[in-house]
Design a protein with these regions (language model features):
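Conserved RNase H-like, two-metal-ion catalytic cores of nucleic-acid enzymes
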Residues: 2-135
Length: 135
């Protein structure tokens, strides 16, 4: 019975519809969490695609006070935002010089730079580095 209930939850008609976010105003943003989703087929053999020019950004997840959103740019099933619109908005965001939070910041910020979005901010916190220090 429990298995059937769990399977029922997985059926498409029970999944909430994803709503495309709008680009919110970023003026005055103090801190932002950033996570990139990428297609990086040769990461295990050549390293990060941002450094080897292999692969591409698939989407960008952003969270700051009052906003949590995901901006797909190269999903195979569509629903993508125009890449240039996302890049333009990200450039505005980083010009506010927020504290940037990432998990594996070298990777995400490397991809942003390869993608044409410089994240020249004063402070970056990396939870990949911080996590072992907390334990």
């Amino acid at each position: 019975m429990i298995f059937e209930q769990q399977m029922d939850l997985l059926k498409k008609e029970n999944k909430p519809e994803w709503t495309r976010p709008k680009f919110p105003d970023v003026s005055g943003i103090k801190q932002v969490a950033v996570d990139l989703e990428t297609h990086d087929p040769e990461i295990k053999t050549l390293g990060g695609g941002w450094a080897t020019n292999k692969g591409f950004v698939v989407g960008v997840a952003i969270s700051f006070e009052g906003f949590d959103g995901y901006f797909p740019v190269r999903h195979e099933r569509g629903g993508n935002f125009p890449e240039e619109d996302v890049k333009k908005w990200l450039r505005k965001l980083f010009k506010e010089d927020p504290i940037v939070l990432c998990h594996n910041a070298v990777y995400d910020l490397g991809w942003l730079r390869r993608w044409g979005v410089d994240c020249n901010v004063t402070k970056v916190y990396d939870t990949l580095i911080a996590a072992p220090l907390v334990d």
